[in-house]
Regions:
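Glycan-recognition and catalytic cores of secretory/periplasmic carbohydrate-active enzymes
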Residues: 1-180
């Protein structure tokens, strides 16, 4: 839905036609239906609790693979644009939640080790597992990190920074570094 969201906003900016703004809002509502609006509770022994991961603002990977990822950081600039176009503060709040989630548990140095995996500076998990996937796995599996450190999570954050400018209010966030 992100390409449609962005296109609707581009067309609204170009034409001023309110129908495109309405379509952008429809895309935003749909996109928002895939995001966590709350922070789930996890045992103190979980990765989520130990490293300070919060579910609010995370995006569901898919219906059949309900992990959480930071894909929403890609759409954060469009939520800011929609806020500007409508004046509706909820869209800025959604952008902020998406951004905050996308900046959780980033390794700030080359010494961060999680689950035996040394994280490079700037490394972040590709997915966060809020639940266990099968009854054959232990319940304790809830709230764990995968250890796949791929580049798209960083690329999407960089896109948002490039689009909005580094000093944008969206990026004035509290400390979200990975707690050792």
């Amino acid at each position: 839905v992100w390409p449609l969201f962005r296109a609707a906003l581009d067309l609204f900016d170009e034409t001023g036609d309110a129908a495109y703004r309405t379509r952008a809002e429809m895309c935003a509502y749909y996109f928002d239906s895939w995001t966590y609006r709350y922070d789930a509770l996890y045992p103190a022994t979980s990765d989520f609790a130990r490293y300070g991961y919060h579910t609010r603002g995370g995006t569901a990977v898919s219906v059949q693979h309900h992990a959480i990822d930071s894909w929403g950081s890609l759409a954060a600039p469009e939520f800011v644009r929609l806020w500007r176009a409508t004046g509706d503060a909820r869209w800025f709040a959604r952008a902020r939640a998406l951004w905050h989630n996308a900046t959780l548990c980033i390794a700030l140095d080359d010494k961060t080790v999680i689950n035996g995996t040394l994280r490079p500076r700037g490394g972040q998990n590709e997915a966060f597992f809020g639940c266990r996937w099968t009854r054959y796995r232990p319940v304790e599996e809830r709230g764990h990190f995968n250890n796949w450190l791929i580049s798209w999570v960083n690329a999407y954050r960089l896109y948002a920074i490039h689009t909005l400018g580094f000093d944008h209010a969206l990026f004035q966030v509290e400390e979200n570094a990975c707690k050792p």
